[in-house]
Amino acid sequence: IEGDYSYRTLPASVLNIMRRYIPALILPDKKPIETENNFHFDMHIYNTELLSTVFQIPVKVYTHSTIKGYFNDKAQRLRVEGYFPRLRYENKFIESGMFLCENPGDQFHTRLRFSNRKSSGAVNIALEAQAQNNSIQTTLNWGNSSTVTYSGKLAAVAHFIREQKEANESKRKLPPLKTVIDVQPTNVILNDTLWDIHPSQVVLDSGKVYVNDFYFSHKDRHLRINGIVSPHPEDTVRLDLKEINIGYVFDIADLGVNFKGEATGPAFASGVLENPVMSTDLFIRNLGLNEGLLGDANIHGEWHHDVKGIYLDARSEE
């Protein structure tokens, strides 16, 4: 490390730079800290035993890794670039890890890429985000290398807004943060099947989450979500399913229970963030459990918050 730097003021320097791009999200300090960091660095990592033993950070680096870049408070510029060919975090093995943070122009740009190695194969992850004008555009790509394909792309733009709702409102009172997330149209592959994610919008405002027509489909099959997620019992979110394979959920969650079947029908949830009340009435075609076929079934389900359990009333036809 060469140059002028202070560990005490470095976090404030980073926030000062990022505030230029998303000022509605990162507010100024009540007591501004003077920062004069101007340095560059080139670090080579061979052994991380100190992190594990002294700081209790469960990281082990297996090969030569590097972190390099520069920081200039006066020019309001930074760049941090890291390469980690092979490491372990807790029980997760990471290969070909790379991250980059920089602001060469009118955007703050972040990129992260790695492979999560598992016994059944590897999952490749690539995340990219650009911040500018109180907005963050994020793209996530992933893909696996096992016999059954799970891969795809998620993309969204988050807009951060703080505005005075009333003309006579005190200027000293901080306006609440409102976040508008525009979900972009993309595709994902689940169990070798191509699904479409359609444009939709999610709004976070005053402690509530408004979901406006989230729509996920493959031909005639679909999942649609509308409603309000909040702590209040009068706010309800509705899910409409048509021939959705419930096996997707159990495959991804890896719960050790193998349910199969195609679900059609509505599901409702209210007061989700505090005392959730949930109910569903589904018709499941070819319901199966742990490789055994139970037949078609009509299922009424309820979440009982007092006992934190699920009540199911299922009637099946073989």
Model-derived segments and their meaning:
Residues I1-E318:
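Interface amphipathic segments
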